[in-house]
Amino acid sequence: MARKSLIQREKKRQKLEQKYHSIRRSSKKEISKVPSLSDKWEIYGKLQSLPRNSAPTRLHRRCFLTGRPRANYRDFGLSGHILREMVHACLLPGATRSSW
């Protein structure tokens, strides 16, 4: 189980990313349209003034049961060992153990 502070920090980053997503996207589009270098530098300054945690690259996918940040399966939103336990207990419909 991940510490609660780490999970809350990740939720805070998600909120910030959603809040500044449109500003970040419009600034990046504006950079590609502006021909002069001095205007581009001004827009880069605006991008740098945004909070660091609002960048989408700072987000991590976490297991929604344990909060584990590694070995997550996107389809289920679970970490590998929790996914395995749930499949063995037949708690995930449509997921079967492989046998050959």
Curated annotation (Swiss-Prot):
The keyword Kinase is assigned to this record: no
Subcellular location: Plastid, Chloroplast
InterPro entries assigned: Ribosomal_uS14 (IPR001209), Ribosomal_uS14_bac/plastid (IPR023036), Ribosomal_uS14_CS (IPR018271)
A Pfam match: Ribosomal_S14
Main localisation: plastid
Positions of region (Disordered): 1-31
Keywords: Chloroplast, Plastid, Ribonucleoprotein, Ribosomal protein, RNA-binding, rRNA-binding
Gene3D superfamilies on file: 1.10.287.1480
UniProt-recorded name of the protein: Small ribosomal subunit protein uS14c
Lineage, highest ranks first: Eukaryota, Viridiplantae, Streptophyta, Embryophyta, Tracheophyta
Gene symbol of the encoding locus: rps14
